[in-house]
Amino acid sequence: MKRGLFVGRFQPVHKGHIKALEFVFDQVDEVIIGIGSAQASHTLKNPFTTGERMEMLIRALDESGLSKKKRYYLIPLPDINFNAIWVPYVESMVPKFEVVFTGNSLVAQLFRERGYKVVVQPMFKKDILSATEIRRRMIEGEPWEDLVPKSVAEYIKEIRGVERIRMLATNLESSEKELQAPIRIPEY
């Protein structure tokens, strides 16, 4: 049995991720999907929580039919910001795997140095199928829904994700004092 690893931040999950995962699912028996920057949320670069990203992946994989095709695992991978030991860290966090799928040259290099087979999966419409571009469109009020699976667009609306991203993008001068005030727990 051959198991592959695919790591992404999925902020949010988009059609390019699903196209890449279709390629990955065709190459191996089981797929480990590592959710990078798992500790990060509520920032412009990482607006969604790990749980929200997992929900997006589950819904998108169900919608695409991939969830019925192969067994997959969703594994949160918090950042360690230490490239030289990142691969052993990932190895300690996920089940055993034989091949890594990536479009990131640093990730490819780090895994090759540790002796892994690395497959550079095709990138699909990278200019527009990019989470950065999707978040930009959300902020600017431009159409973004066609760039993500329908189930993901619906979920982002359910959790008011666009409103969150717009809030994170605003200056918030009028609310600055309120946001900087310490949270006080009422005494009873």
From Swiss-Prot:
Pathway listed? Cofactor biosynthesis; NAD(+) biosynthesis; NAD(+) from nicotinamide D-ribonucleotide: step 1/1
Q: Which GO terms describe its molecular function?
A: ATP binding; nicotinamide-nucleotide adenylyltransferase activity
Q: Which residues cross the membrane?
A: none
Q: Where in the cell is it found?
A: Cytoplasm
InterPro entries in the cross-refs: Cyt_trans-like, NMN_Atrans_arc, Rossmann-like_a/b/a_fold
Q: Per UniProt, what is one Pfam family of this protein?
A: CTP_transf_like
Q: What is this protein called?
A: Nicotinamide-nucleotide adenylyltransferase
Which organism is this protein's natural source?
Pyrococcus furiosus (strain ATCC 43587 / DSM 3638 / JCM 8422 / Vc1)
